[in-house]
Amino acid sequence: HSVGYLSRINFRAFSKALENLTEAHGVTAGQWRILRVLWEEDGITQREISERVGITEATAVKGLAGLETAKLITREVDKSDRRKMVTRLTTKAKRLKKKLIPFVVDVNERALKGISQKDVDIARRVLAQTYLNLTAN
């Protein structure tokens, strides 16, 4: 199989495994990726979220709408630029971080079971370089 195919099926397997654990808290794998970005930096725009997650703005809108319905985020007009909407985590979302982070650790541990640290390091380097190759201008 090609590296692209293997990357794709691994992404889907990781997403499904994570979603199986997070869905009990009403969070999809896509929403998890948005929350992760907001936990790193709260109060950013939809465009910044889509760029950091690596999704289209349309996909971000859908994920943000679900998070807003679940009362995990709020969206408000940016005070410095009224054309932009700023996304902020609610207290509920901040508390949820402590519950969801262990799920990610669990999924990663299961995925890497039986693989040496040396091989994991090589895989990280290869995946990082393929990403750089594909996103270079």
Q: What are the functions of these language-model segments?
A:
Residues V37, R52:
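Residues within the alpha-helical elements of helix-turn-helix
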Residues H1-H25:
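N-terminal leader segment of winged-helix/HTH proteins
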Residues S15, A65-R125:
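Charged, amphipathic alpha-helical coiled-coil/dimerization segments
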Residues V3-Y5, H25-R36, R47, V61:
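Short alpha-helical elements of helix-turn-helix
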Residues D119-N137:
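Exposed, interaction-prone assembly regions rather than primary DNA-binding/catalytic cores
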Residues E41-T45:
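Short capping segments at the starts of secondary-structure elements
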Residues I55-T59:
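Helix-turn-helix DNA-binding motif, specifically the short coil turn and the N-cap/start of the second
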Residues I49-S50, L67:
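Append "Primarily bacterial transcriptional regulators
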